[in-house]
Amino acid sequence: MAIILYGNRLSPFVEKVHRGLMLKQIPFQQHEPHGPFDLRRNNPTTGKMPALDLDGQRLFDSTLILRALDEFKPEPPLLSPDPPIAAQQRLLEDWADESLYWYGMVLRWNIPANTTRTIKLICKDLPPVVRPLIKLMAPRFVASQTRAQGLGRLPLNVLLQELDRHLANLVQLLGDGPFFFSTSQPSIADLAVFGQLGFLYSPVTPEGTAAVEKYSELLEFCQRLDAMTD
């Protein structure tokens, strides 16, 4: 039975799962959505990307999907055999998904020039009939989400200062590397952070790119993981 990943790699969560599949060398197909209705069709539980067909089941949520992949193919493992390190890896994965993600969202949707670039990037692969709907609804809807989350209420200079502090903290957690918590193999934490750093380091968010470029250690980390999962 074919393993199918549903979602577009512009999403850091789809990228996270894509890299996990590549790391484990699991053959799969990728189906990209052609509009918002495909999201609900592919993932009726949450209506979000990614979703994955695996072993006869339709899975959702990047964290749950990676957990299932570790059971489906245990090697290479996505968690350290050392329980304290594994606990830290789980926490970092959750932080990247639930906190760092929103810095990228604010930079994309709360700065008008970036919003224009983001919509152009999203719409280029969508059917023409869907594009006006995305252009009309997405900016207002997503910007309201960032304000409800909290980061969207911050002045840009404060947001960038906080982002810089978090990136500096990531360098400390990377330690001697090559992967987070000085481990020799990538884990769920590395996959999650990689996805979010790529989300920040994008032509549509020059502020995010500049923030990440300050830390050569993070760029080198991304290059290492990319080489293992490309």
Predicted regions and their residues:
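Structural signal for well-ordered, non-membrane alpha-helices
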Residues: 97, 167-171, 226
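GST-like fold's C-terminal all-alpha helical module
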Residues: 102-213, 217
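GST-like domain detector, emphasizing the conserved glutathione-binding G-site
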Residues: 1-132
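Residues within well-ordered alpha-helical secondary structure of globular protein domains
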Residues: 71, 95, 197, 224-227
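Intrinsically disordered, low-complexity polar regions and short flexible loop motifs
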Residues: 218-224
